[in-house]
């Protein structure tokens, strides 16, 4: 369920302050954050934010099409490596044919 419009978007105060300071200075550094629930505002465009995925920080370059989404959407927390590969059937079918 989406957040109520009267409340406004959640953006971590310290993260927003760091972005605004960098915008005023014209700097482009990677910013580490643990705030996956922060909404991406138009001020974030052009910056790289390293979002924590539970194990390490994933660098996310913020583009203009990401505005309105949350930072955590771009740093996956689960890695799927495929199903177990054992017990593969012989080539040519599983059961012998009847004549």
UniProtKB/Swiss-Prot annotation:
GO terms for cellular component: cytoplasm; small ribosomal subunit. Transmembrane segments: none annotated. Pfam families: Ribosomal_S19. It comes from the Bacteria. GO terms for molecular function: rRNA binding; structural constituent of ribosome. Coiled coil: none annotated. Gene3D superfamilies: 30s Ribosomal Protein S19, Chain A (3.30.860.10). The keyword Ribosomal protein applies. One of its GO terms (biological process) is ribosomal small subunit assembly. Keywords: Ribonucleoprotein, Ribosomal protein, RNA-binding, rRNA-binding. InterPro entries: Ribosomal_uS19, Ribosomal_uS19_bac-type, Ribosomal_uS19_CS, Ribosomal_uS19_SF. Residues 76-99 are annotated as: Disordered. Protein S19 forms a complex with S13 that binds strongly to the 16S ribosomal RNA. NCBIfam families: rpsS_bact (TIGR01050). Belongs to the universal ribosomal protein uS19 family. This is Small ribosomal subunit protein uS19. It comes from Pelodictyon phaeoclathratiforme (strain DSM 5477 / BU-1). The gene is rpsS.
């Amino acid at each position: 369920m989406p957040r109520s419009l009267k409340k406004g978007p959640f953006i971590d105060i310290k993260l927003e302050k760091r972005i605004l300071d960098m915008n005023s200075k014209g700097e482009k550094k990677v910013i580490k954050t643990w705030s996956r629930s922060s909404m991406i505002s138009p001020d974030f465009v052009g910056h790289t934010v390293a979002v924590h995925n539970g194990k390490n920080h994933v660098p996310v370059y913020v583009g203009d099409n990401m505005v309105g989404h949350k930072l955590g959407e771009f740093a996956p927390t689960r890695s799927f490596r495929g199903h177990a590969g054992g017990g593969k059937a012989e080539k040519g079918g599983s059961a012998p044919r009847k004549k």
